Amino acid sequence: MKISKFTIMEKIITNHHRVIFILSVILFRIILESSYINAIPNSLLFTSYNLSPSFNNYLISWAIFFLLIPFISDWFTKASDYFFIIFLLVVITPMLIIYGYDAVLSNSTSNSIFSLVETVNSKSIIGIIISFLFIQLILRLKMPLFKNLPVFKHGFYIAITISSLFVVFLIFWYYISGVYFNLDLSKVYDLRVFNSNLSSKGFFAYTNGWTYNIFNMFLLSVALLKRKTILVILIICVQIYFFAGSAHKAVLFMPILILFLYFFSNRTPSLIIIPISLILICTMTMVLFTFFDQRFLLGIFLRRLFFIPADLTFAYFDFFSTNPHVYWSNSVLKSFISYPYDSLSVSFKIGSYIGEPKMYANSGFISSGYAHAGYLGILLYSFILGILVKLVDYMSKNSVPPWFAASIIITPFIFVLTSADLLVVGLTHGMFISLILIFLSRGVGLAQK
C-alpha cells in the first residue's frame, strides 16, 4: 500500500506537534526581531528609536520568552487558547524585543542584572508577566457560580434577531447621517473624526461600534456555521460598507480573522497555524519593503500591530512612574476623586508626553491599569479579564464550537490587549455584548457543527 507524502508529513506533525509548535514560535520571534532591526527604523515609532542592544536585557528577554511558552497551548480546544497565544506573540514578544535591543529606552547603563529591575522598561516587563501569569491562575480556579447560569431555549434566535436589527439600522443610519463613504485606506485618518461627528454622537458612539465590531461579525459566524455561502458574501459586503462609513481600518480586517478561525479550525485544531501565519505576514511585509519599497503593510502589520502598542506601553509606564496615577477619576470614580490632568485625557496626555500632542495614544489594559493604580491596577484588570475569559470558556464548553465563541470575542480580545482600557472595551468595543451573544447561543446543539 502506497502512502502519500502528505500522509507522512501529517504523521510527523502529529507525533512531534509540540516541538514543531515551539520551534515555530521561536522562529516567529527571530523574524520579528529582524524586522525591528531592519525595517522599523524606516517606519518611525512614536517615541525615539534607539538600536543599542543590552546583553543583559537581551538574555533576560529570551529567558522570559522561554519561560512563558509552556503556558500557551498548541491545540485549539477553547477560546482562551487563542487569547493566550495572541497575548504572548502579539503583545509580550514585541515588548521583549524592544527591551533587549534598546538599552537607552531602558535607562540602563549598569552591567548588573539586579539594577535592571529598577528601570522603567523592566517595570513594564514585570507588569506584563504578572498579568499573563495571574490570568493563567484565574483560569485554573474552579468557579461554581458559573454552573448556575440558565440556558434560554430560543436564545440563539433571539441573538440573531437582535444582531440583524442593529445591522439593518446602521446601514440606513450611515446613509441618513450623511457620512462620507471612503474605501481608500490612506485617507481613513482624515475622515474618521468628520464621519464620527456626523454619525457617532451620544448613544450612537456605542451602538455603531457594537454593530460593526460584534453584531455583524456574529451574523458572519452564524452564516459560516450554517454554511450559507451567499449570506457570508452579503455580510462581508455589509462590513465593507461599515468600513467605508466608519473610517476604521480594523473594521475591514475583522471578517478576515473570522474566516481564518473558521477554515483552519474546521480542518485541524492545531495552533501551529498562528505562528506560521504571523511568520508569513512578517516575511512578506519585509520582502515588499526591502525589494519594492512598499511601506503600506509595514505600517499596518509590523508597526501598528506589534511595535506601536509595545512602544506605547513603555511610554505609559515611563510617564506614570513619576506622575500621579488616575485612580479612575476620569470615569467610574470621577464623583469621588479629582482628575489630576485638567481636561486632557490620559491618551492625549501620553501623546503630548511623547511629542505627539494631537495623537490619541491609547494602549491596552496593562498600560491603562498601570495608569489608574500602578501594579494594583494591573492586578485588578487582570483579575476581571481572567474572570471574563474563563466565563467565555465555560459558556462555550459543550455548547458552541470553540471557533464560534472565539470569533464573537476575538475583536474585544485584541482591543483590550493592544489598544483600549478594559472598561472602554467592555462598553464601547462590545465585550459585554459579545458575552451576551455567547450566553444566548448556548443550548441549541451547536457544539457538533
Task: Give the location of each predicted region.
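Active-site beta-strand/loop microenvironment that shapes enzyme catalytic pockets
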Residues: V238-L252, L257-L261, I366-Y394
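Membrane-anchoring hydrophobic segments
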Residues: M1-F215, L219-L220, I273, L380-Y381, ...
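Juxtamembrane/interfacial segments around transmembrane helices
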Residues: Y206-V222, L261-R267, M284-T290, V326-K334, ...
